[in-house]
């Protein structure tokens, strides 16, 4: 098996790691950084930028710069969180077969395709660092991701050209990185607050076993929400001062987002910061500037209810684990948003103990994913990872009730069967509506998908026996089957849920991504060829001005003609590498006379210098000093 990389595909930033020679280490990207912004931008020239380059141009290109795509991964348009995202994000979120997608310049992209572009960059950076091709990967997801979101994440990996060996939960990966070398069994809590998601997990680690006891969280709570509170405050203050509502100005909103993110970071170490955005907008009276001094206390007042939600969830999860807070040995802080002082204070207060900040909150999840990759590959022996399903799973039964087959907190992989019957006499078909959630009624839970079982033998209601089986694999992805015991008729479905992608569509996206990769490679080669050609043209012009008189007029004319041809092709922005190379070769071939003249001139200069030195030496009179 080739090398296996571990990937933390984050809302704000992503990270990739590799397990080598007994340890897991982060792979820096081509820019030399350990994390890559999860940002994808589409330029007017048709380029696709990923990472830092995409983030840098976001202010000037807000509608075609996609960030926080993880927040709509596997989401249906009719869900509350989708509506919230649509109101918040500057790019266009559209309906694609009922699921969330984004529209860029008239073309629709699924969240899987956008995420795949981030994964492709991580893959390419890993290959450049390792010096070999990489295909196999372990990708992490928030523990509270539902089946649709997990499936969509795996599809993103497939589109990026990766063989996703395993999808594992982020807190579990962090615990694996933290607890691998722990010999004695200890119960720990991983508090994971990232850019867009929150998880809290109680685990038992020790003697190469990492067992999840309970997990919970909110797939729509994170640092982005802290930023949004600050943005709302700035918009409100600006409106009360000027009467102008910045919410209708996408470029202003993008600047506000950047400023809010920076202010949040500054307030993690400073007690006060100033937000200064000159020329944020303009009206009939002229340009307007936004300047606001913000204290840490004011910011904490904006977000205290959000932090409070995470503390409530801590109490629930500890209770689900069947332990008391006194049983917890360590509280491990994971995710960039755990740097916020209020978060640290409240978590510390909740457990009445010092927090464990020994791990890098931005990197530990990827490191754990790489360890899991090494376990699968066989490089790490005797490590047992026991994860759980975060939400209960079941089907809709008579009266719109949810009948649970698998309770939340069940260790995965797992398989469970239950027998149901018909609701009406002589019913020949049933619809199996697969649900995920904790509410009693089907309508209050998430429907992951449904399918029909037909060909049931006619019988009075309650007589037919229909066996429904739920099978969750190690990735937490669900397959459901139904079988009529009398007729033997069976039907099964691997729940695709709201990812909404068929096998054919995924294959098409894989091919499209590969084609774009070729296009990007050609575009990069053309840019490099253009830069080299520009340099050659400049050097040739300089040499002609200095040495042109020292070569025959005929040769000079040929060089000037070839130089003009090269300049002409460089004016064409769409010129390919091959077109540029032809003109570069032509100029190089006719420029040899110029090179000869320069060489002769340099040698002549050297000879003159030597003669001058000799003359000076001849003028020296040897003398002895007594």
UniProtKB/Swiss-Prot annotation:
Taxonomic source organism: Campylobacter fetus subsp. fetus (strain 82-40)
Similarity comment text for this entry: Belongs to the heat shock protein 70 family.
Comp. bias intervals (Basic and acidic residues): 512-528, 539-551
GO molecular function: ATP binding; ATP-dependent protein folding chaperone; unfolded protein binding
Gene for this chain: dnaK
Protein task: Acts as a chaperone.
InterPro entries, per database record: ATPase_NBD, Chaperone_DnaK, Heat_shock_70_CS, HSP70_C_sf, HSP70_peptide-bd_sf, Hsp_70_fam
Keywords tagged on the record: ATP-binding, Chaperone, Nucleotide-binding, Phosphoprotein, Stress response
Gene3D superfamilies: 1.20.1270.10, 3.30.420.40, Actin, Chain A, domain 4 (3.90.640.10), Substrate Binding Domain Of DNAk, Chain A, domain 1 (2.60.34.10)
Protein name per the record: Chaperone protein DnaK
PANTHER family in alphabetical order: HEAT SHOCK PROTEIN 70KDA
Stimuli inducing this protein: By stress conditions e.g. heat shock.
